[in-house]
Amino acid sequence: MAAILASASVSTMKTLWETKIQKIQENHNNQRRKPRSRLVAADVWEERHTLARLRDKVKMQDGRLLLCLEQEDWKALPGCLVRLSQVQEWHIHRTGLQKIPSFISLFSNLLVLDLSRNGVTEIPKEIGSLTQLRELLLSYNKVRFVPEELGDCESLERLELAINRELDRLPDKLSQLRRLVRVDLSMNAFGTIPPCLLRMPALEWLDMGGNRLRSLPQDIYRMQKLRALWLQRNLLETVPESVGRMSRLDTLVLSGNRLSDIPPVMEKMDNLRFVNFRDNPLTLEMAAAVDEEEREMFGREFMLTYIQEARKRALDEAN
């Protein structure tokens, strides 16, 4: 009987100790969880605070929801921004933004993505999910590469990549952009007009001023709907005669190149209303206009006079 009691007493003591140890362990675990809980709570509070800040920057304009951030510190956009996926336009300027988040693909209703004047270095391939996007504005950034997925943005009408400095090519797939009307690639490092631009059926306005163009493609006339072509401050020495087949062209800016002559075929470009050959080493010396305003206004007259004078001198030399 004593042995049984002793055994029961040992068993009871063992159970008590095990229970005590378990409670100590639970208390220890609870103490470890508390800092984590505090961190989680802090994260939740920070996310709510950030989301509230972003919501304050959303406004309605012309029936659209716009997110507008100007001169604030947003080097990276927080994940909580996806809670505002109904926004149709982003206008984020001078924030130091360095990266377009991959979750941009969740903004399926986005019409305008304007991230001008930031520090964006690349365009994510997820951009191709934005099939409703009409305007992509990334001028004054540091973009060096354009992904071919941009060619999937079938609604794109306006593309601005000016002053990215080192950008020097576009993927061929961009020729799929059947609605693209306006392209600004000025102040970059292009050595030639990207072939994809020649196959964009709706293109009307192209600025490639301030690049490194040394020549123009012979099939430049394929841009049949082009109305304005800006090629100022390049390294062009000649203009191909095929430019005469660009029947809708009404503005042609060639100032600040290395042109020595004007193609006679341009005399027949009846739609050409504004043309600028200023600051080129043209072979013939023509009388200067009274002032800059007059010179700009009579650019076409200067061109016609130059061509006629060149023809006359050629005949005189032949005789």
Language model: regions and residue ranges:
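A contiguous binding-surface segment within folded domains or other stable secondary-structure elements
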Residues: 215, 226-251
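The feature captures the LRR N-terminal capping module
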Residues: 1-196, 200-218, 227-228, 241, ...
